[in-house]
Amino acid sequence: ATYKVKLVTPSGQPLEFECPDDVYILDQAEEEGIDLPYSCRAGSCSSCAGKVKNGNVDQSDGSFLDDDQIGEGWVLTCVAYPTSDVVIETHKEEELTA
């Protein structure tokens, strides 16, 4: 399946694209020419952190976030597959690690 992903960046400009359910959101964003923050690309740091505002993702490949953080909506875009249409606020590392 393919889902609609909407990224809300700090500029407030929402960026929308379609993402297959077997492609990481970060990877698909790059394919679309969208520049998002990242570092390890393995789900073991917080550089790519965002917050899911609507919809669902599968980020079981990641290890950095604990269950409480995931429950609060935190997401690592480098290891997140969309499992529905999803809205994500990006560039949230400072808020996550504060």
From Swiss-Prot:
2Fe-2S ferredoxin-type domain location: 3-94
Co-factor note (free text): Binds 1 [2Fe-2S] cluster.
Main localization category: plastid
Any single Pfam family the record assigns to this protein: Fer2
Gene Ontology cellular component list: chloroplast stroma
Keywords (A to Z) from UniProt: 2Fe-2S, Chloroplast, Electron transport, Iron, Iron-sulfur, Metal-binding, Plastid, Transport
Subcellular location(s) of the protein: Plastid, Chloroplast
GO biological process: electron transport chain
GO MF terms held by the record: 2 iron, 2 sulfur cluster binding; electron transfer activity; metal ion binding
Sequence positions that bind [2Fe-2S] cluster: 40, 45, 48, 78
Needed co-factor(s): [2Fe-2S] cluster
PROSITE patterns: 2FE2S_FER_1, 2FE2S_FER_2
Coiled coil spans: none
NCBIfam families registered for this protein in UniProt: fdx_plant (TIGR02008)
Function: Ferredoxins are iron-sulfur proteins that transfer electrons in a wide variety of metabolic reactions.
Record family assignment: Belongs to the 2Fe2S plant-type ferredoxin family.
Protein name according to UniProt: Ferredoxin-B
Originating species: Alocasia macrorrhizos (Giant taro)
